[in-house]
Amino acid sequence: MNDAVAIDVRGLSKSFDGKRVVRDLTLTVARGEIFGFLGPNGSGKTTSIRMLCGLLIPDAGEGHCLGYDVIRETAQIKREVGYMTQRFSLYEDLSVRENLDFVARIYGVQNRARVVDAAIERLGLAQRREQLAGTLSGGWKQRLALAATTLHNPKLLLLDEPTAGVDPKARRDFWLAIHQLAAEGITVLVSTHYMDEAERCHRLAYLSFGQILTQGTPSQVAASSGLTTWVVAGPDLMQLAEALQRLPAVAQVVPFGDALHVSGTDAAQLATALAPYQARVELTWTQTQPGLEDVFIQLVTEAGEGKA
């Protein structure tokens, strides 16, 4: 396996009770890269992450994580990985420092006190080191969980929807910490529902019904979508949206603040269909690049139609 590659898997699949949850997962992630997994609930994100870090054995496929075989060397993978689950899993009746000291003991961390103090400083927890974990806000709990996840100096972080239910400022601060860790050479694989977080990833993949529908940098994903998108502003937008949604050339109409994003997969047909509406003086039309949310709404719509 190339030393520059952290994850290289091909054709990973997993079923539960006869239902295929992940199908033919093929993925390459570079060392020091932040790679995002996006998709609706039940799309296979968590199962994929658990297979990559050795917590689940795939039913089919092959590959390596950190140079170890994902089927035969799962114990070695686990020692090199930090896995942060969706739910806060530390002890709420212990302080910040007590929790970190406990986790460090479990991992057998040498120079435990120094390592714990360094983690507290790195994640900005110094003012809260004696505070009980149960009294922390959601954002501070996530910082504490991230500190615990990195105590044993892992080479790969797997973060499963780490900022769900966290306010925007706390999410931003959390992502600053993730980028700092990536800059230090740690590879990060993260699942998220938030489009602004997806744009913070170096590369990303979108899953639906257990399959990767698209992957690449955020700009590559948007450019390869085949969508043409217009932004329209003006009065009575909800009535306008209802009318536009009835046009065959319009794939989707999505409200964004005080405007609508109107997208289609055939630029010429879309232009023809929108021409009468673009002639209305009370409406302002601007063509724009499709955003990730435009792309992902289209992907999940197409995937749902394919399963119908």
Identify what each model region corresponds to.
Residues 157-160:
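Catalytic Walker B motif of ABC-type/P-loop ATPase nucleotide-binding domains
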Residues 176-265:
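ABC transporter nucleotide-binding domain
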Residues 93, 132-136:
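Conserved ABC ATPase signature
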